[in-house]
Amino acid sequence: MVGSGTDSRYLMYFFTASHPKIGEWLKADMAKHNFCFDPDYRAWDNPVGGSDQQSFHLKGVPIVWYHTGGQPNYNFPSDEAQTINYPKLTDITRASYLTTWHLANEAEY
C-alpha cells in the first residue's frame, strides 16, 4: 500500500533498468513538484516477486513500482484508514500520473 509505511518520507522506486528514462522522469518531477517523499531509486534488471508488476515484466513491458516498505497491519483486520499517510499517498498518485503522462508522450514508448 503506497500510502502506508512506518517512515513518512521513505519510498522505493523500482523501474526497469533497460529504460533509465523512467528513473530520470521522477528525478525531474521531484525537482519541479517538491513531492513529500524521498525516493530510493532502484533500477531492476530482473524483477521477482508476487506483486502486480511481475506479469508485465515477463511480457517485456517496462515496469514502475512504488513501495513504501509496508506496515505491520497491512492486509489484516486491524489495518485501518488512520494508518494511511494521505499527503504521501496523494503525491505518489501525482507522480504516478506524471510517469504515465511521460510514457504516453515519449516517442520511444
Which residues fall in each region the model found?
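Active-site-adjacent substrate-binding region
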Residues: 4-109
